[in-house]
Amino acid sequence: MNEKHQTPAETLATEHARTIWWARHLTVHNRDPRLRGKKAPALHCGACQEVYAELEPGNIASTMGTAAAEHIKAAHPDFWVELIAHATRCLEAARICWDRRNIIRPDLRPTLHENELFKNRTNIHVPCPVDCGVTLHDALTADQIQDEATLQFSDEAVEHCITRLAEHLMRHRRSQIAQLL
């Protein structure tokens, strides 16, 4: 995947695909029949049982995520299409929730908090709009905050917050995302 030419939804789906558990099974024994000429350690897909990446000791962490995303896109195109559609809905839901940030329930509104360690930064806490109990935390610089009272931020900060929220929403079911749209 050439990440330079991906849509925001494709980028979000790729990041999420890197963490999908069923595509990241580790084969550590060379006698495993799935290897078929490849050597362990290797990654195999729990859905199709294909061994799709040999791992070297120095690249295990970086290869696992990238290879899993590539495998899902190549070997499971129907799932990939659904993942892109889900990412698109999550981005849309995140934008809608961000636009409604001043009119939603008070406990689901983003809040600003003083950063105790770095005085030149302010922490923003963004609760999950699905109300799952997760609160996303990020730090903003003073120049990214345009108005604290109405939660107005620079375009860069807004895009970052929306992307972070969409990344979290990817973990929720489609029906939960549909309720936000």
Q: Model regions: which residues?
A:
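Short, flexible, mixed-charge glycine/proline-rich loop motifs
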Residues: 29-40, 113-123
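C-terminal recognition-helix end and immediately following basic linker
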Residues: 59-84, 145-178
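Short recognition patches in nucleic-acid-associated and regulatory proteins
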Residues: 28-30, 51-59, 133-156
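Short cysteine-rich clusters marking metal-coordination/redox-active sites
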Residues: 45-48, 128-130
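Short intrinsically disordered terminal tails
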Residues: 1-9, 175-181
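Intrinsically disordered, low-complexity linkers and flanking regions associated
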Residues: 7-32, 85-112
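Disulfide-bonded cysteine motifs in exported proteins
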Residues: 40-43, 123, 127, 156
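Extended non-catalytic scaffold regions that mediate assembly and binding
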Residues: 112-113, 126, 145
